[in-house]
Amino acid sequence: MQKIVIYTTATCPSCIGAKKLLDRKKLKYSEIAVDKDPAKREEMIELSGRRSVPQIFINDKPIGGFDDLSALDRSGKLDSLLLKNE
């Protein structure tokens, strides 16, 4: 089973969009709220090299943000990535 982690903030529209996309695909994920925990924000930056949210990881591989996740989904590559990692 794939491990999906998404770093978010409470008021981020792209974070909400990413979670809706994952929910629509019935994928389970762990959400880490970086607006409530500065150490988790630093962890996200260290792992992804980015400061923006959301940051999405599948099996510890950085996927990027909502635009990146959406592009993978539209191209069919998200399903392939998830199947490959099952």
Regions found by a protein language model. Give the residues of each.
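Non-catalytic, surface beta->alpha helical segment in thiol-disulfide oxidoreductase systems
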Residues: I58-N85
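Thiol-based oxidoreductase modules, predominantly thioredoxin-like and allied folds used
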Residues: K28-K40
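Structural micro-motif
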Residues: S48-F57, D67
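Local sequence-structure signature of Cys/Sec-based thiol-disulfide redox active-site neighborhoods
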Residues: M1-K28
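C-terminal alpha-helical interaction module
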Residues: M1-T8, R41, S75-G76, L82-E86
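Short alpha-helical
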Residues: P13, A39, G64
